[in-house]
């Protein structure tokens, strides 16, 4: 168990307990300003403007959560998802990444760009391992103790060129993230079972220790256009083996964005 795992659980429980009295009807109360998600290098893009970088994309979400939204009290489910997303975001920022999107019970994050792809991949791997381990081995026992049904998590990641483009209208727009790497990372996350972390072929190619990888039974993915067929593999990442690096890596980074590191 890691110190980061304990912080993760504390963040979830603090938000879950502290927000119970914060329910308001929409439109009531003062409007407060909050910092939005996104990558600071691309926040200033104009409508239609696009730029790209090589980056590790990471997706984390809660498995079997749709069934929970069906059976359980809607406000309780919302509060639990919110609390876990807060902890997901904390892990990402502690490890120098950027939260690029929050949807329902899942998070999309980016790590980089940095000159050495192995750095982005290693840190994204540690972030995924930290979150999954924290839920399984630290948070869930504490939820059970409080009479709350445990949750399950999974992750997916890949690496490659990623485009940022501001899309929408002059009245309402946001920076959209597009590319094969983030798209395939999302597919990896969907291919993962509970407690699994699945990574794409290019991401896996930057993992030095091959014993950390196990070929996924559904690999490779086939892509066909006209008369040409190509394949792209994906693997299970043995995330438990990387937990030994979590606390020291967080201490070393101290929340500094990876792109600001001098390596």
Residue ranges of each PLM-predicted region?
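Acidic, metal/cofactor-coordinating or nucleic-acid-engaging core segments within structured domains
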Residues: 125, 129, 133-145, 258
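Active-site/pore-lining binding-face segments in mid-to-C-terminal subdomains
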Residues: 149-215
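Short acidic-hydrophobic sequence patches enriched in Asp/Glu that either
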Residues: 123, 127, 177-180
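Catalytic NTP-binding/metal-coordinating core of nucleotidyl cyclase/transferase enzymes
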Residues: 44-123
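Catalytic core of nucleotidyl cyclases, primarily class III adenylyl/guanylyl cyclases
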Residues: 95-120, 140-178
